[in-house]
Swiss-Prot record:
Top-level taxon: Archaea
Residue intervals passing through the bilayer: none
Localization per record: Cell membrane
Similarity-based family: Belongs to the ATPase alpha/beta chains family.
Native source species: Thermofilum pendens (strain DSM 2475 / Hrk 5)
Protein name: A-type ATP synthase subunit B
Parts forming coiled coils: none
Organism classification: Archaea, Thermoproteota, Thermoprotei, Thermofilales, Thermofilaceae
Biological function: Component of the A-type ATP synthase that produces ATP from ADP in the presence of a proton gradient across the membrane. The B chain is a regulatory subunit.
Keyword hit for Transmembrane: no
UniProt-listed NCBIfam families: PRK04196.1 (NF003235)
Length: 460
């Protein structure tokens, strides 16, 4: 009934961990098939090995497992079957269907561990992805193949933003195929229901693959979920020539699971108890995104993480910032003012933006307009800080203009509806409309010929 080498008996059961003695050969991350008294097949992964002993983490249901449990060590790591049929499907964190449809039976078996893209094989990202969110498209443009994270804080609407981007994101150009892979990591039930409702009601599910790991699932499953999502994305991008946007929420839950598993293995902890290899572990995930020379498809990564205590120096955001190509911050202050999405403009950055905008990609005025909006808004924020000290009446006429600009910029440009999908042309035109509050002589970062072509005063 159980082909291959099978071990009967478990020395100890600690929650979802099985301690097995008398093991001759076992490897870290090896898949183990587990059979209880009901003969039902379960799966586990080897967390730790030593001479004659192995620690196995059970994936999924643990009911009915006792000390006389049967374990079969398969000799391979976790694999999933991928094909074009994955599009439109919803899976759990072990890639088992949870949408009432049958499992994927045809296609290729792929190991989920994967490999980062060889730097020599990489092509520099240079094509624009439209999210429909003005603050992102206009000021921190996302480029195909980029790794652009959202740095948030618990209580802010990062899940709303993730759902909106998943619904609205698209690539420009005829004949370009686009798909979204959504990885929910450590989601609460209400969060998972929200995402599924959004994807199904808006029709986004038709071009989307969802891999949902729940908060009550084993920690080791959270370590698998982003890798499963990226394995699916690699197949769609590099085998089917699609442009794939991978959204991961919340990577903080992934890092917490990494710390939990590391502690269970008895490893020496690093900063705040996180393993010393967390940086390289995150890199094995993030560096799977990109564009490969000679391949038509691309993988763009949009991870979302909540900074514990809002601390940017916490190991999770700190290490993430070294790997990714920019970051977008969400602001508690702007959220309290009723602004959605509450994107904190001044500390946010997209390092690859300039390669993905301009003539033939977005519009010739995009770069100049973004620079001017950022500059004017920073002056407006300084004027607001000054007004808090001396009062608005004490400001110069120039500072009052910039203060008014900052308010209009936040309320009209940054602020937009959850179901409002703005094209890049609408975003840029709106930017010019807000800039028209300022005198033309203040637009020092825009060439005169661009002003005369796009400024509302000349266009009207």
């Amino acid at each position: 009934m159980y082909p291959g080498k099978v071990y009967r008996g478990v020395k100890e059961i600690r929650g979802s961990l099985l301690i097995v003695d008398g093991i001759e050969e076992a490897a870290y991350d090896e898949v183990v098939k587990i059979y209880g008294k009901d003969s039902r097949e379960r799966f586990g992964r080897v967390l730790e090995t030593s001479i004659g002993q192995a620690v196995v983490q059970v994936l999924g249901d643990r009911e009915g497992l006792e000390t006389d449990t049967l374990l079969k060590f398969t000799g391979s790591t976790f694999k999933i079957r991928v094909s074009e049929d994955v599009i439109g499907r919803v899976f759990n964190g072990r890639f088992e269907p949870i949408d009432g449809l049958p499992p994927i039976l045809s296609g290729e078996l792929r190991e989920i561990t994967g490999e980062p893209i060889n730097p020599i094989s990489r092509e520099y990202p240079h094509d624009f992805i439209q999210t429909g969110v003005s603050a992102i498209d206009g000021l921190f443009s996302m480029v195909r193949g980029q790794k652009l994270p959202i740095f948030s804080v618990s209580g802010l609407p990062h899940n709303l933003l993730a759902a909106q981007v998943a619904r609205q994101a698209t690539v420009r150009g005829e004949g370009e195929q686009f798909a979204v892979v959504f990885a929910g990591i450590g989601l609460r039930k209400t969060e998972a229901e929200f995402f599924l409702e959004q994807f199904r009601e808006t029709g986004a599910i038709e071009r989307l693959v969802a891999v949902l790991n729940m908060a009550d699932d084993p920690a080791v499953e959270r370590l698998m979920t982003p890798r499963i999502a990226l394995t699916v994305a690699e197949y769609l991008a590099f085998d089917l020539d699609m442009h794939v946007l991978v959204i991961m929420s919340d990577m903080t839950n992934y890092c917490e699971a990494l710390r939990e598993v590391s502690s269970a293995r008895g490893e020496i902890p690093g900063r705040l108890g996180y393993p010393g290899y967390m940086y390289s572990d995150l890199a094995t995930i993030y560096e799977r995104a990109g564009v490969i020379k000679g391949k038509k498809g691309s993988i763009t990564l949009f991870p979302i993480l909540t900074m514990p205590g809002g601390d940017l120096r916490h190991p999770i955001p700190d290490l993430t910032g070294y790997i990714t190509e920019g970051q977008i911050f969400l602001s508690q202050e702007m959220y309290a003012q009723g602004i959605y999405p509450p994107i904190n403009i001044l500390p946010s950055l997209s390092r690859l933006m300039k390669s993905g905008i301009g003539p033939g990609k977005t519009r010739e005025d995009h770069r100049y307009l973004a620079d001017q909006l950022y500059d004017a808004y920073s002056r407006g924020v300084k004027a607001r800080d000054l007004a808090r000290i001396i009062g608005e009446i004490g400001l110069s006429e120039r500072n009052r203009r910039f203060l008014k600009f900052a308010e209009e910029f936040e309320n009209k440009f940054v602020n937009q509806g959850f179901y409002e999908n703005r094209s890049i042309e609408e975003t840029l035109d709106l930017g010019w409309q807000v800039l028209s509050i300022l005198p033309e002589e203040e637009l020092v970062r825009i060439p005169q010929k661009i002003i005369e072509k796009y400024h509302p005063k000349y266009r009207s």
